[in-house]
């Protein structure tokens, strides 16, 4: 299980330039992540996704985010997300803990 505060720091350093988490937050280069857990890939209303994201057909949950965040381009070939990923398991756990808390 990850630590929310450590995950928040990772989000601010590595994710916040492209993503927001607030309810009704705006899309940036990447989609707003509010409500991501339980949502299918490529489904944030008002965001222009690649076909690869729309067609992946998985539902975001802890396990799928954990795998995706290690190497986004490997998990969804054709995604426009330029983030290289988080190789450290603990960092991914912390980030997911933060996303769980911040995007309900």
From Swiss-Prot:
Q: Which InterPro entries match?
A: Cyt_c-like_dom (IPR009056), Cyt_c-like_dom_sf (IPR036909), Cyt_c_1A/1B (IPR002327)
Superkingdom of origin:
Eukaryota
**Species the sequence originates in:** Asterias rubens (Common European starfish)
Q: Tell me the PANTHER family matching this sequence.
A: CYTOCHROME C (PTHR11961)
Per UniProt, the keywords (alphabetical) are: Electron transport, Heme, Iron, Metal-binding, Mitochondrion, Respiratory chain, Transport
What's an example GO cellular component term for this entry? Answer: mitochondrial intermembrane space
Q: List the disulfide bonds.
A: none
- State the family it belongs to: Belongs to the cytochrome c family.
- Does this entry carry the keyword Mitochondrion? yes
Where found, per UniProt?
A: Mitochondrion intermembrane space
One GO MF annotation is: heme binding
Q: Does the keyword Protein biosynthesis apply?
A: no
Name listed for the protein in its UniProt record:
Cytochrome c
Residues that, per the record, bind heme c = 15, 18-19, 81
Function of the protein: Electron carrier protein. The oxidized form of the cytochrome c heme group can accept an electron from the heme group of the cytochrome c1 subunit of cytochrome reductase. Cytochrome c then transfers this electron to the cytochrome oxidase complex, the final protein carrier in the mitochondrial electron-transport chain.
Q: How is it modified after translation?
A: Binds 1 c group covalently group per subunit.
């Amino acid at each position: 299980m990850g630590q929310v505060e450590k995950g928040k720091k990772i989000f601010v350093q590595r994710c916040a330039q492209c993503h927001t988490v607030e309810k009704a937050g705006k899309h940036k280069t990447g989609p707003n992540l509010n409500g991501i857990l339980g949502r299918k890939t490529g489904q944030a209303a008002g965001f222009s996704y690649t076909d690869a994201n729309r067609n992946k057909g998985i539902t975001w949950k802890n396990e799928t985010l954990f795998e995706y965040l290690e190497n986004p381009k490997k998990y969804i070939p054709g995604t426009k997300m330029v983030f290289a990923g988080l190789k450290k398991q603990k960092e991914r756990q912390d980030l997911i803990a933060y996303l769980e808390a911040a995007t309900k």
